[in-house]
């Protein structure tokens, strides 16, 4: 790109990972954990250059001596001071850009509280002095990335899962459903069921090890009961994992019991429908005339949709809920882990989008509430 100096920045702040890069690129340049870590102990070595806080990968690598906090919970920012640190780290350390020289596209969870949106806008203009910014809904960007304008997106990340029906580019707010069950809950559940096997994982640092086990070894069973029977009768499903200290642990039915909670939240003690039923309920809240288009364009997105077997299982479950003649298509693009970011990159580089940005001037005239008028 020759005009790199005016490229818009696209920042997808997820509960678990932050994805950032330049509009027009086909993948984010920076991907790091949305973590701020603070030392657990008092420093005793002088001149070590110890900091009072660490962000992202650096916090991850020093996790043994830090207390790790995630400023975004269930897709919504709960700690603004830490969030500011993450944005600062994104601009200055990861992308190495001056935010006052680039428009910034941020993403937000559907049904985000209005005050949250305003606060994001305020920080961008007042702390980072961006010339222009925009806030886009994550699921809508995933649909853009799949090349569609109509469909239902089941977006499931680390902190929250949403089903968002979109028709001709418009999200249908009355039919958006939110499920507070996502990757972080699955990590916690895996910690719990591994403890039942006699392995102990308790600290915030150990949780990160379990997250790695989950990402490398878990999968979704097509038929849970049958898979349980197979696991009980043979060791064909067992896998081993080497912990950082060299100890090797074996994991069997936990591999599919963990993500099964997405389809059976009762496993986590939650009284709520699974992701398949939530998707179906969301479709049923839409006008009868557009349901057919939604069934045929069901798009999976987000890191928690990366389990092998999840698309086939969704197909099976939704087929059993929907009318028998209905054509159902589950779209699970291979790059779905980053499809929100990719959609943002596409959107921010469209020529028709350029008049959509909120400029510093508009912000100065109207204040943070401008975001509700300009960003849907």
Swiss-Prot record:
Question: Key word Cytoplasm present in the record?
Answer: yes
SMART domains hit by this protein? ACTIN (SM00268)
SUPFAM superfamilies to which the protein is assigned, alphabetical: Actin-like ATPase domain (SSF53067)
Task: Give the GO cellular component terms, alphabetically.
Answer: cytoplasm; cytoskeleton
Gene Ontology molecular functions: ATP binding; hydrolase activity
- Keywords per UniProt: Acetylation, ATP-binding, Cytoplasm, Cytoskeleton, Hydrolase, Nucleotide-binding
Q: Which reaction does it catalyse?
A: ATP + H2O = ADP + phosphate + H(+)
What's the superkingdom here?
Eukaryota
Q: Cellular location of this protein? A: Cytoplasm, Cytoskeleton
What EC numbers are recorded for this enzyme? Answer: 3.6.4.-
- Keyword Transmembrane helix included in the entry's annotation: no
What is the top EC class of this enzyme, as a single word? Answer: hydrolase
Residues of the propeptide region, as annotated, are 1-2
Name the PROSITE patterns on file.
ACTINS_1, ACTINS_2, ACTINS_ACT_LIKE
Q: Which residues carry this modification: N-acetylaspartate?
A: 3
Q: Which Pfam families match?
A: Actin (PF00022)
Similarity-based family: Belongs to the actin family.
- Role according to the record: Actins are highly conserved proteins that are involved in various types of cell motility and are ubiquitously expressed in all eukaryotic cells.
**PANTHER family listed in its UniProt record:** ACTIN
Q: What is this protein called?
A: Actin-1
Query: From which organism does this entry originate?
Result: Saccoglossus kowalevskii
């Amino acid at each position: 790109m020759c005009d790199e100096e005016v490229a818009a920045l696209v920042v997808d702040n997820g509960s678990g990972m932050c994805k950032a890069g330049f509009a027009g690129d086909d993948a984010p340049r920076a991907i790091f954990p949305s973590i701020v870590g603070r030392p657990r102990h008092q420093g005793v070595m002088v001149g070590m250059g110890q900091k009072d806080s660490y962000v992202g990968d650096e916090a991850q690598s020093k996790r043994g001596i830090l207390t790790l906090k995630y400023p975004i919970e269930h897709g919504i920012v709960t700690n603004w001071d830490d969030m500011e640190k993450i944005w600062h780290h994104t601009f200055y350390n990861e992308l190495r850009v001056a935010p006052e020289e680039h428009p910034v596209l941020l993403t937000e969870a559907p049904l985000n509280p209005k005050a949250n949106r305003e606060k994001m806008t305020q920080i961008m203009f007042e702390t980072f002095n961006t010339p222009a910014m925009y806030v886009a809904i994550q699921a809508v960007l995933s649909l853009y990335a799949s090349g569609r304008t109509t469909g239902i997106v089941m977006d499931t990340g680390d902190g929250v899962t949403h089903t968002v029906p979109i028709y001709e580019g418009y999200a249908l707010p009355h039919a958006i459903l939110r499920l507070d069950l996502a990757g972080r809950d699955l990590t916690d559940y895996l910690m719990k069921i591994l403890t039942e096997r006699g392995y102990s994982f308790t600290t915030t640092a150990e949780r990160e090890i379990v997250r790695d086990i989950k990402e490398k070894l878990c999968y979704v069973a097509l038929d849970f009961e049958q898979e349980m029977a197979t696991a009980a009768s043979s060791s064909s499903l067992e896998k081993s994992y080497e912990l950082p200290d060299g100890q090797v642990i074996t994991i069997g039915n936990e591999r599919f019991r963990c993500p099964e909670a997405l389809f059976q939240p009762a496993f986590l003690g939650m009284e709520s429908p699974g992701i398949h039923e939530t998707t179906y309920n969301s479709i049923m809240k839409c006008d009868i005339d557009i349901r057919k288009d939604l069934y045929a364009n069901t798009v999976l997105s987000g890191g928690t949709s990366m389990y092998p077997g999840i698309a086939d299982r969704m197909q099976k479950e939704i087929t059993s809920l929907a009318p028998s003649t209905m054509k159902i298509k589950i779209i699970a693009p291979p790059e779905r882990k980053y499809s929100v970011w990719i959609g943002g990159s596409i959107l921010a580089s469209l020529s028709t989008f350029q008049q959509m940005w909120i400029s510093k001037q508009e912000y100065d005239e109207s204040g943070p509430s401008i975001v509700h008028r300009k960003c849907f």
